[in-house]
A protein has these predicted regions:
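Hydrophobic faces of well-ordered beta-strands that scaffold small-molecule active sites
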Residues: 7-13, 42, 61-65, 94-96, ...
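Short, structured coil segments at secondary-structure junctions
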Residues: 57, 89-90, 119
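N-terminal amphipathic alpha-helix/helix-capping segment at the start of soluble metabolic enzymes
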Residues: 1-21
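Short, acidic/turn-prone active-site loops that include or flank metal/cofactor-
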Residues: 66-70
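A short, N-terminal amphipathic alpha-helix
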Residues: 32-38
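Active-site-adjacent beta->alpha loops and helix N-cap segments on the catalytic face
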Residues: 20-24, 43-62, 73-80, 98-116, ...
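Conserved, mostly hydrophobic/aromatic
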Residues: 34, 53, 86, 136
């Protein structure tokens, strides 16, 4: 997937429950509009939205799940549970928070990345510093 999108536009099609555009139907239409506008990939949140987006475009999808945990500030694909949800809907790439903060349940980013790669799926690191980028690499 990386070669397909490198140097090209990836459009994020996401809306959370408290946002006005929250709806799998709307996200599917946003992804269709992104496709028509020349996007090379879609970044999407949650199983329902991703399944709807797949009905509207053949573009590769970078999947995330945003979920809060009491024992961690990590919010973007924080645990194996969210990774498994994304694997179940067949995304081409999974993005994870790769900041230097503790993950929920004591999980480790290295273990999640190894697990994702063992399933043949690419990973993307969401980082907040140059140092985190080097570590994620």
């Amino acid at each position: 997937m990386l070669n397909e999108v490198k140097g090209k536009l990836i459009i994020s099609c996401q809306a959370l429950p408290d946002e006005p555009l929250h709806s799998p139907f709307i996200m599917g239409r946003m992804a269709l509009a992104a496709t028509m506008a020349g996007a090379s990939g879609i970044r999407a949140q949650g199983m329902a939205d991703i399944l709807e987006i797949k009905q509207n475009t053949k573009l590769p999808i970078i999947g995330i799940v945003k979920r809060n945990y009491d024992d961690s500030e990590i919010y973007i694909t924080p645990t194996k549970k969210e990774v498994d949800e994304l694997l179940a809907v067949g995304v081409e790439m999974i993005a994870l928070d790769a900041t230097n903060r503790p993950r929920p349940n004591g999980e480790k980013i290295e273990d999640l990345v190894a697990y994702i790669k063992s399933k043949g799926v690419e990973t993307m690191a969401d980082c907040s510093t140059i140092e985190e980028c080097y570590e994620a690499e």
